[in-house]
């Protein structure tokens, strides 16, 4: 009986994927693509873009931060969706 309960617990953990971590791109502007695993149960990736004296800038990462006027932000919820 204990073996059956332990087996059911393991199957439940595997099926629910309790250890899932969202993966987001985190490269800046025109750098080569890189990714990072988000921490703290983060459920969003973002891509923030703006223009300044250096030209068109892009920032990517985990979360969905608030931005100032003139900065465009796109937030999404699937792995590597912010490229």
Swiss-Prot record:
Origin: domain of life: Eukaryota
Keyword Disulfide bond: yes
Pfam families hit by this protein: Toxin_cobra-type
An annotated Gene Ontology molecular function: ion channel regulator activity
Residues making up the signal peptide according to the UniProt record: 1-21
Compartments, record wording: Secreted
GO cellular component assignments: extracellular region
Family membership noted in the UniProt record: Belongs to the three-finger toxin family. Short-chain subfamily. Type I alpha-neurotoxin sub-subfamily.
Protein name, entry field: Alpha-neurotoxin NTX-2
Annotated source species: Naja sputatrix (Malayan spitting cobra)
Top-level taxonomy: Eukaryota, Metazoa, Chordata, Craniata, Vertebrata
